[in-house]
Amino acid sequence: MTLSCRGLMGCPPTLALWVLVCGCNQAAPAFTEPMTLGGREVSADTLNQGRDLYFKYCVSCHGETGAGDGPAARSLKFPPRDFRVAKFSFAKDGELPAHQALVDRIRSGVPERGMPPWTGMREEDLSALADYIKTFSPAWREAAPEAVP
């Protein structure tokens, strides 16, 4: 069998739909290098683990680029957080939250704003997810290391 489509409009409708659906559901490219986020180096393996979790649990509300524009966002009373701007109400004075504070917020969720708690997720997964979320904003790459209490 030979398919000869010149662009999407020249394809049979079912094939065009299949291409659109499959092509729009691609995860972000894999990380091959570590990144410094919040002043600490995060391995490529951890970032890839976080990316996989994000695309499994978060992308429907927060969107592929972390902009809060996922397909489910339209049905929510409050818009999901836009991770690109790195502003968190639970951080003091508009600063970036500590890594553990971000992990804790993911775990507990924000039920009153539509974000479910992820209490059943392993600590390692929560941490990797928090690290991946940081990749959306340059603020995390520019941040100094967290102060040790």
Which residue ranges define each predicted feature?
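Bacterial N-terminal signal peptides that target proteins for export
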Residues: T2-T14
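C-terminal motif of bacterial Sec signal peptides marking the signal peptidase cleavage site
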Residues: L20-G23
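Electrostatic cytochrome c docking/interface patches
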Residues: N25-L53, A143-P149
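Periplasmic/extracellular electron-transfer cofactor-ligation site
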Residues: A27-A30, R51-F78, S108-G114, F136-A143
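Short, solvent-exposed loop/helix junctions and linker helices
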Residues: A44-N48, D52-F55, K92-P97, E123
